[in-house]
Amino acid sequence: MGMAMSENLLRYGNVAKPLVLYNRTREKAEAHSSRLGDCEVANSLPAAVSVSDIIWLCLQDQTAVEETFQEILPAEIRSKLFVDSSTTNPETADSIARRLSDRGAFFVALPVMGGPPLALSRSLTCIASGDRESVDRIRPYIEGVGEKPGAALLLKLLGNFLIMATIETVAEAHAFAEKCGIDTTNMDKLLRAVFPLPPHALYNRQMVTGECFSGKPLVEVSKALQLTGHVMEMAKKHGASVKIYEIARQHLEIVQENAGPDADITAIYGAVRMESGLPFSTITE
């Protein structure tokens, strides 16, 4: 994701060149730099921060975000703008914003929705929150939603709720149809007629073709479980009823148990099939 985003910033963002890159695995940054050109790989995170006015981060999980900012905060960062496109919980985003502000720096939370293919095609949905002046500095790329950084993460989590509910709905529809003796082809036609556009069409294709069991994952189930954990925490904190989401998360756990942590998120279909007395996968040896 970060590689696709940095490529688009370089190609279309009218940024100063060379673009400074940093990755904890230096070999990845070197290979990415060689492929793109007009890039410079920093030897360390503080070195990357020191020569940059805007520092854009996209990290794997909340632990990586917290560790990275622990390394950044002692440096001279006054007047620098940090844009974080990682997915954390809202409290973490607000805490980082406060700590950066105490050091005279600025922060925009910019979680994104969509996988690497959408990032490459410049089709990600970006949700920005931060003080107005900071958001204005990156406005050529996004539309802001407010001044509290945690608001962006809340919207990202709500977006994930919609995604998981959609996957669960499509999976249950297919399993229901099969148990009733409806041919997969006819159910596919119905879904494409009623919901011809993404996301329903995308998840339907994954399930009908069997790619949810054997293809390259849209999102690994292990990462989906991390994110759904944040959503469940938010729902519990605010007293919200999210029963369909709870069921979808339980199905993710079943997927991980049966197909491993790298299985696709849409293999929820397999969990629903098992509960309906069908084989987990539609693919036969």
UniProtKB/Swiss-Prot annotation:
Documented EC number(s): 1.1.1.-
The protein's annotated pathway: Secondary metabolite biosynthesis
Gene3D superfamilies: N-(1-d-carboxylethyl)-l-norvaline Dehydrogenase, domain 2, NAD(P)-binding Rossmann-like Domain
Transmembrane segments: none
Function: Nonribosomal peptide synthetase that mediates the biosynthesis of usterphenyllins and uscandidusins, p-terphenyl derivatives. Within the pathway, ucdB alone catalyzes both reduction and dehydration of atromentin to form a terphenyl triol intermediate. The pathway begin with the biosynthesis of 4-hydroxyphenylpyruvate (HPPA) from L-tyrosine, possibly by the aminotransferase ucdG. The nonribosomal peptide synthetase ucdA then condenses two HPPA units to produce atromentin.
Pfam families: NAD_binding_11 (PF14833), NAD_binding_2 (PF03446)
Identification of the protein by name: NADH-dependent oxidoreductase ucdB
Disruption phenotype: Impairs the production of usterphenyllins and uscandidusins, and leads to the accumulation of atromentin.
Organism: Aspergillus ustus
InterPro entries cross-referenced by the UniProt entry: 6-PGluconate_DH-like_C_sf, 6PGD_dom2, 6PGDH_NADP-bd, HIBADH-like_NADP-bd, HIBADH-related, HIBADH-related_NP60_sf, NAD(P)-bd_dom_sf
UniProt-listed PANTHER family: 6-PHOSPHOGLUCONATE DEHYDROGENASE NADP-BINDING DOMAIN-CONTAINING PROTEIN-RELATED (PTHR43580:SF8), OXIDOREDUCTASE GLYR1-RELATED (PTHR43580)
Superkingdom, natural source: Eukaryota
Record keywords: NAD, Oxidoreductase
Binding site for NAD(+): T87
Gene Ontology MF: a single term: NAD binding
Active-site residues annotated for this sequence: K156
Family label: Belongs to the HIBADH-related family. NP60 subfamily.
Broadest EC class assigned to this enzyme: oxidoreductase
